[in-house]
Structure formats: C-alpha cells, structure tokens
Amino acid sequence: MGAPGLETRAGGPNGKSYLLLASVGAAVLGTLLLSVPITVLTVLALMPQEQGGQVADPSGPGGQLLQQLGFHKLPVESRSDLSPIPPAAHLIGIAKSSHGLRWVSGYEEAFLKSGTQFLGDEGLLALPQDGIYFLYCHIGYRGRAPSGGEQFRSQAGDPGVPVTLSSQLFRARGASGSGEPELLLQGFETVTPPVQHARGVGQGPLWYATVGFGGLVQLRGGEKIYVNVSHLELVDFRRGKTFFGAVMVG
C-alpha cells in the first residue's frame, strides 16, 4: 500500500509542476550564461582599434553603438598645445684685462633660451617677447686687508673709510623711448675690511662680500637690459660668484 502512494505523489499535478519549473529555470539560466559573454565579445569587436596612430571613426555603426552603451572617446592633447620653454638667459662674469668685467653666454652654466640674445660687445641682453620677467644679479667681491703698518684707503682716497659696493640693473634707452637708461633694480653693501695690526710683514687676511638682488619687471619684446658694477678691481670671478640673468614668468 505504501508504494502506490509514493507513485501517486510523483505522478500527480504537484510533481509535474515542480518538474516544469525546474526545466524553465534551467533554460533561463543557460540563456543568461550564453548571452553575457556574447555581448562582451560584441562590444570588444566594435570598439575602435588604434592602427598606425589613427583611431576608427566614432560616427560609424560601431562608434554609435559604443556611445549608446556609454563609451565616449576622451580628447587627446596634441603636442602643439604644450607650452614652449619661456625666454630665459643666464650670463656669467669673467675677468677682463686691466681690472675689467666681461659677460659671456657660452661659458660654464651660462645659456640663452627661446630667442634671447646677448650683444657681447655692448653687454646688452635682449629679450624677445612682451611679458613679466624675473631679473636677478649677483656680484661677488673679495679683497685683502692691508698688512701691519698700512692703512686701508677707500677708492675715494680717504684712509679708513668703509667701501660701499653696488650693482645696478638698467633698461637700455628706457621704456618711454626718451633715450635715457632706466634704473630697474639695484643693490648695495658697505664693508669695512679688517686691518691687520700684527707687527710682522706680509699680507693681511682676505675678506668677502656679496651684492645680490632680484625682482619682477614688465618688459616689451626687443628691450635690452644691462648691469653696472662698482669697484671692478674687487670683483670675484671664481665659479658661481658673479652672474646675472632673466626668465619670463608671465
């Protein structure tokens, strides 16, 4: 009697419903498993391929489908959009005969960039573009204190008077076209070299000083700048001591 009861349950309406639901669920799951990879492969096949630096036209069928699916081509920055090196110059001072100073543009760390020109015979630095420039100047000085029994004499001839060292940066012929140079930046330093009071003979101790400055100046293209330096006989020409330059910053 127990066996027929089991057969009645399996073959009844409820058993058939369970079998039907299981079959439908398996069919739906199989369809989903097959459709997902097929969709992915289709999208990959329709994506624009880069060939020889050229990207497929997004207006074509593949590009339109990608846009509908949410894919958008990002803009590519061209090399022409990159800013060029701004005008810049760095000049180095070297010794000239008979206590002179000469600026050079092709020595050690000196350089000229992006259209800047240096007129060596006149000592003028020409700037090619309108803009705001950072101008700077650094002059090193050194000397030797008088030996015992001597008195230090300033360049004016007064014994024992401190020396005021100075350097000035000018715009040649001025911005107004008046023909007069225009002072842009300047720096000063007053030094009193030590006097050696020892009784022995020989040279006194060395002393060192620096006059440096920098600032922002608005210049027009083609304008020229130059530097005036005092006490040329005391200028320090060792590496990294005496230089001036300009770089456009805006």
UniProtKB/Swiss-Prot annotation:
Subcellular location: Membrane
MF terms (GO), sorted A to Z: cytokine activity; tumor necrosis factor receptor binding
Glycosylated sites: 228
Assigned keywords, A-Z: Cytokine, Glycoprotein, Membrane, Signal-anchor, Transmembrane, Transmembrane helix
Chief location bin: membrane
GO biological process terms on file: immune response
Extracellular side: 48-250
Transmembrane region(s): 27-47
One GO cellular component term noted in the UniProt record for this chain: membrane
Residue span, THD domain: 87-249
Keyword Glycoprotein listed: yes
Topology relative to the membrane: Single-pass type II membrane protein
Database matches in PROSITE patterns: THD_1 (PS00251), THD_2 (PS50049)
UniProt topological domain (Cytoplasmic) ranges: 1-26
Task performed by this protein: Cytokine that binds to LTBR/TNFRSF3. May play a specific role in immune response regulation. Provides the membrane anchor for the attachment of the heterotrimeric complex to the cell surface.
Subunit structure: Heterotrimer of either two LTB and one LTA subunits or (less prevalent) two LTA and one LTB subunits.
Family note: Belongs to the tumor necrosis factor family.
Protein name: Lymphotoxin-beta
Biological source species: Notamacropus eugenii
Record gene name: LTB
